[in-house]
Amino acid sequence: MILIEDSITNDLYQNCAKELDEKLYEHCWKSSSLNWLSDVKKGVDGSCIITPVSDTIKHLLEQELKSSLPKHRELEFNYYIWQHHAGISWHNDIAHDRAFGATLYLNDQWHPDNGGWFIWEDDNGYHTILPKKKFLIISDNYQHHCVTPVAMGFRCTIQIWGLL
């Protein structure tokens, strides 16, 4: 697991936040719950909606994150909005034809009581990350992890996938 604070510039963060706000009013969203395996969604009520980032934002993210992300020939970038009760139980990403996943947090302020914690397990035990603006988490497709259900607000991220 790789954890990076302030992974992008404030300017790029503002551009991402602006584009996300604009996309909220477009008919471009789909439910990611359709893609999750039933055992992964077990016990989770809410859903998460997704839409691709624009080519412009994708290019800017690739440039700013190129030294942080694993080298990969094809990257996919999507906005995710985790709604009330949305979360995902313990899983890894092996079944999804991905080499790695990365989560870039877009919430400006997030209270611990809002839920949406990213939890992972390794040889040293369990670890948690609260959503924090510009924080980047990178994990390989074998990393066991989950996201606790969102209690309040909307958990906004850019999910980055290194595709196989």
Put a short name on every predicted segment.
Residues H59-E62, K66-L164:
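Catalytic core of non-heme Fe(II) oxygenases with the double-stranded beta-helix
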Residues M1-P70:
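Non-heme Fe(II)/2-oxoglutarate
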